[in-house]
Structures are given as C-alpha cells and as structure tokens.
Swiss-Prot record:
Mn 1 as annotated region, ranges: 312-325
Keywords: Cell cycle, Cell projection, Cilium, Cytoplasm, Cytoplasmic vesicle, Cytoskeleton, Differentiation, Fertilization, Flagellum, Nucleus, Spermatogenesis
Composition-biased stretches (Polar residues): 1-21, 51-60
InterPro entries the record matches: Sperm-assoc_Ag8
Official protein name in the record: Sperm-associated antigen 8
GO biological process, one term: single fertilization
Gene from which this protein is expressed: Spag8
Organism: Mus musculus
Amino acid sequence: METTESTEGSLSRSCDVQPSSERLDTPSEPVPSSSSSPRSTAPAEAPAQYSVLTEPSSDSLYGAPCPPAHHRGHGFGFQPFYVSCIPQDPCNMADLSSRADPTSSYPCHSSVHGSGSGTCGLGQSSEPSQGSGPTSGPAPASVPSLVSGPDSASGPDSSASGPALASGPGPADPGQGPKFSTCIPQGYRCIPVDLAPDYNAWCQHLHWKPQRSWEPLQVSEPGVRGPYKPPEPGALGPCEPCEPCEPPEAESEETLCKARPRGQCLLYNWEEERATNQLDQIPPLQDGSESYFFRHGHQGLLTTQPQSPMSSSTTQRDSYQLPRHICQPLRGKREAMLEMLLRHQICKEVQAEQEPARKLFETESVTHHDYRVELVRAAPPASTKPHDYRQEQPETFWIQRAARLPGVSDIRTLDTPFRKNCSFSTPVPLSLGQPLPYELESGPHQVGVISSLACQGGGQGCGRTKTTPI
C-alpha cells in the first residue's frame, strides 16, 4: 500500500524545475525522482535533454519537463528516446565511461521492469526515502536518468539540479531494490553531428549583411540576355559548423549607392528600356531619400530640349486663392453705393453721346402715308338763322332723305306733312283744281330759302329752289 501511494504521489508531481544555462554549477530545488532504491544525486553540469522528434536547435524545449513515455511513444507507434549533451567535465566523463552498461539503450528504459508506468524526468528529490539507510560515496557527474519504475524513493539528503542519476559506488541495501545502471550507453558517447545543435548556423543571423547591388543589364542586340553570373559560394547554404562564423565585412558606401535597376522589361528588344536603363535606378544616399525624388521629380527624364528649364506654373498654383476674412468686409457700404451710382451715371452719358435722340411720331398705316389723305371730323353744320321748334317741322332721318325716296309727296312748305304722294294715283276729276306736284303753295309758312337741313342730303330741289314773292 505504501508503494502504491508513493507511486501515485510521484506521478502527480511534475518535474517543473530545470537547470539554468547561466548557473550550471549551482543545484536547484529538489524534485521527486522515479526510482525504487535510495540513491544520491549530484549537481548537474550539462544542459537539459531534448527530443529527437523535435528540432535539435529549438530553444523552446530547453528546460521543458519530459512527459510520461506512454503519452508520447504510443501515439507514433514506437517508443521515443532522449539524449543529452556530452558532459563538459572530462574527468567525470572518463569515470562514467569506465562503468558502461550496454543493457540500457533508452533514457526511459531500465533493467528493472516495474508493473506501473513511471515518469522520465530529472533526478531531483525532496521526499524522505522509503528505503532503508542513506547512501554514501562520492557523487559522480550528472548523466541522464536511465531508470523508471513505479516506486519513488530517495534519500533525505539527496538533491540535484540535473538529470536523474543513479547512486554512486557507495554501500546500499541490495535487498530493498534492484540495481540501476549509472553509465552512459555506448550509442550516446559520440553523438552524431546532425543531432548536436549547430550554433554556428545561427551566426549568420547575428550580423546584418547588406544586400549586394545589382548592375544594370546592358543588352546589345534584341532578344539576347546578359551573361550568366554564377552564385557566390556560401550565399545559398550556411557556413560549415567546424569553422566559426565571422561577421561579414561592411560594404563601402559607394557600393550601396550604386545604381540598381527597378526591374526588367518582358521583351529585351525594346529601345526605350535600353535608353532609360541608366535613369531607372535608386538615387544615391547623399542626394536625399528615395521618397524625395518621387515627390519632386526625377533628375534624368528624357526631353527634346535638355537646356529648357522646367515650368514653374502648375494647375494647383494658378488656381490657388488667398483666404479671405468673411466676417470683416474689405470696404464699407457707402463706398459701394457711391461707386454704383457713378457707374450708372457715366453709362447714361456715354449712351446719350453714342445714340442720337429719336423724334416722336404718330402711328399711321402705309396707306395713310402714301396717299396723304387728311381726315375730317364729322360735325353738324352751323345754323344760318334761328329756328322755332314750335312751328317748324323737326328734322328727322326721313325728312333729310325724303327727296331721295321715290313716291314720296313733295315738300312744298316746312309744315307739309310727311305722307305718301298720291297725286299720280288720284283720278283726274278729283285732282282738278289741285296744285301740281312740286309746286310751292302760298301760305303763311312759305319760306323763300329752304333750310340747310333739307339740302344736306343733296335733294332734287336743293340747288334749284324757286322763290315766289309775297
């Protein structure tokens, strides 16, 4: 029961503390180790383990805890193995190589076959030992842990900051647990070059290497490309790991400022591209920035008149108007009204001088203008003598036109009634003794001169009226 509880306790704890690369000689906090026998550990002097399944040069895995073997190995169909870097202490390495044990080939594999699955982590312990008796003897150099089991036991004075280590050559109780291997496997003594981290390959990223300038391509004939330039050695691949990386030599300013073409045309037989190849380049650094030339123009544009200066007049400059103060008028209202009055007065004077005065005329038609007929107003004629309206017969429309109508009785006197003339139809015996037609009768109303009203219409007796003496 105690073994099961200790196993569960060891599995629940995680190996979070890893040795630091800056302080390799100082021990770190103790972490429980997965082993079934008491053992002592020593400070680790080598960096932490890294997995073969990941990149050797990855820095993110340095100091990461190692998960259980069944969590990783069963997913890929094989059991992964871990390697560590070669110890830096030659004495400890020689001591460990003298006690090599070829039986263990994996870091998480041990000669002891436990019933439970143990954790492959660092050999750091902080729990009291469940075995019998403390361990003694000199502590060897830190090596990767090569044991795993369900039981976790360690001495009360054991603490280490490197990978889990087996106990050194000291007296231990052989009856409390199996013996563990305390040496590096034969296959891990000489790590291949491809598995060891290549720090020389990272040197090319430490120093910035300026990009080499490209020379303008000059094409002599249409359709012919320039000469082939082989790539420089070492430009495509990293430098060899055996030789240390030296910082590249800084190129001179003339090399950086040398012209580089913007691009190349699709057809190499274009005359314009060949003519402007020298102009299509990056401006030198001493003349200003590249954006300055794009804002203010290019220095070497093609023109038919090389000596002609550039025009200073632009659309934006010509259409620019100075801002005006809207709140404050430029001149007063009295000045504006006086100017308007003077303008109208001067315009009238100039118009009067240029255009002559027109004469007033009456409206007349073409016929009136051609015949020059004078129109007379119609008015009653003036009376020659006074009239008595009581005794005289009034002038009417029929009296004025009585002489023009046929069969009308002749008017002999002014008091002659207006009636039909029946003298022509009267029988002869009845007409005897009667005056003849159109003869004036003698009477009190006989007038020697007929009124002008009777003669106005141009009657028959108007001009030949006979007067008889009284």
